[in-house]
Amino acid sequence: MKIGLFIPCYVDALYPEVGVATYKLLKSLALDVDYPLNQTCCGQPMANAGFEKMADNIASRFDQLFDAYDYVVAPSASCAAFVKLYHPRLVKEGHQCLTSKKIMDVVEFLHDVVKPTSLKSKFPHIVSVHNSCHGVRELGLSSPSERNVPQFNKIVDLLRLVDGITICQPERKDECCGFGGMFSVEEPDVSTRMGEDKITRHIATGAEYVTGPDSSCLMHMQGIAKREKKPIKFIHVVQILAAGL
């Protein structure tokens, strides 16, 4: 199978190490990975801000760029969910959106498609798992606590393959961190308070690191923690899965 690697714009600009780790991890599993150099944003910021026509053009270009691949894999539950759920509506007129059926977050792809039974990675640290809203409620990376369904967590399942790691989950484990894209801009006080509450619960686990599938959530909490000098660090889950490669 041929995999097209989609690196979201904020990962490319602010956390390129996450993109590199994703590529290294997929290659270490003997997968055929290609990174299209002329890729751009998926259009989520524009759509969320109300500029739907601008997002429409970007979505159409995205679909054309990644059309040739069997899977499109991204280290971002948020962006993967946007392409999967909203691109078909954006490009519906006279065009069938194909990438929406192919795109997967890297956690989802590894857990559901590749299904590794072992990894070469090592991460001898205590880690608290952050379940992002998009990951839980749009991609099904873990079971939402408000539903009476069997409990599962694909992030935790993959982290258990890492040598030396200790995995924790905070109280109210799938409550929002307060980022929410434009929400953090339009409601900064509420967003910050939600982030503070989430960080407090992660610290209460005794963890050294907070990890999750969305750099945007981690960035939000990291900014608050740094400003308030909180004793905890942040790392994308794919960096842990690729640690030592």
Residue ranges of predicted features:
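Iron-sulfur cluster-binding electron-transfer modules in prokaryotic oxidoreductases
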Residues: 1-245
